[in-house]
Amino acid sequence: MASKRRSSLARVVPLRRARPEPAPAVATPENLNPYDFARLQFNRAADHLGLDPGIRDLLSQPKRQLTVSIPIRMDNKRVKVFTGYRVQHSIARGPSKGGIRFHPGVTLDEVKALAMWMTWKCAVVNIPFGGAKGGVTVDPKKLSMDENERLTRRYTSEISIILGHDRDIPAPDVYTTPQHMAWIMDTFSMTQGFSTLGVVTGKPIPLGGSAGRNEATAEGCFVAIEEAAKRMRLPLKGATAAVQGFGNAGSFVAKFLEEAGAKVVAVSDSRGGIYEKKGLRYDLITAAKEKKGTVTAARGQKISNAELLELPVDILVPAALEGAITRENAARVKAKIVAEAANGPTTPDADDILRSNGTVVIPDILANAGGVTVSYFEWVQDLYSFFWDPDVVRNHLEKTIRRAYEDVAETARRHDTDLRTGALILAVGRVEETTRLRGLFP
């Protein structure tokens, strides 16, 4: 790892569109669904910017949303129908970009929220994409490999009307892999009559994938942690850390922290966690995970995911799903730095509590932006058929995240607010500027 590794916002003619569905009758920040949660965050930033009501209305809802039925023939020869979604929040700054997740808890509101967050994430790191997200309501663990392939290909065919390297570019997300991306690329290419490598990122390297994409989210998160620690005068060597979630992002963050001399004392996955005050060894955890399917098979004191969040550590990395830190447990979070490798792991009420307790929260739209940053690099490489060495990818990623952190910190300082609100102010301001410059058609 190379390190040790306003524009002024003029008012415009109000832009009116149909209002989104109303929030629940009793809606506190803690019980909002993900989409209302995302809009609440957006509105806080919009208030700081004094955003024009028309622009606010436009950016608070998706540009396009597609719900599809996905019939596939199961291995037992019976037909089963799944529900899938693809939401494009904004294309003001370029093609829409965002992952596809296969999970039994996927809902339209969740996908809409994730698409909005992708818009802000791309704007924070200043890459020329808008935000999108996709998902299928399914438990992929209950599908065979052949069923996974048929589901992926049929889903791709259903949403292909809005895909394209210059329109909407998917990527891996929860329970989707480079193999799923290969199936998407191939299916879309068959409808075009030629290979279109740039229609999707996160692909296997032989199909136009980028070096460094697999660990990009974690590497970006680690660089953001470095920046936060530097500003707090917290040496990473000897610092303690806990990582909730040991998938792609969480496992690599743990690895990079260990390499920097930090002591990773706890990790967890969906089955629970382990704790060792003297520090866990990354190689032993991954070996246990590969052999038994869970980190709890490694040696260490068994703890729950909830207990992990409340450990007395310097750095906490929530790298699982949304809503891990809430008003119920936020006051018991003892970490000095919370680096959100997951999307939306901290609720608005919890954010307020952490802020009042002096915890530095590196928001998801900055902390986990490494993935989409290297996806952008992959897209560029595919368009030009010119592929970069791993060190080139790593250096560009590190430079991008450090510059983004500086931009966010400066915006937060200027507005006398926290990093999350600073990141949103920065991102919303950039999207507002391009929206205003483009104007309205017709």
Describe the role of every protein-language-model region.
Residues 26-32, 228-229, 331-442:
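Adenosine-phosphate binding glycine-rich loop
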Residues 103, 123-237:
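Glycine/serine-rich phosphate-binding loop and adjoining beta1-alpha1 elements at the start
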Residues 204, 209-313:
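Glycine-rich phosphate/diphosphate-binding loop of Rossmann-like nucleotide-binding domains
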Residues 26-69:
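Short, Gly/Pro- and small/polar-rich lid/capping loops
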Residues 272-361:
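Rossmann-like adenosine-cofactor binding region
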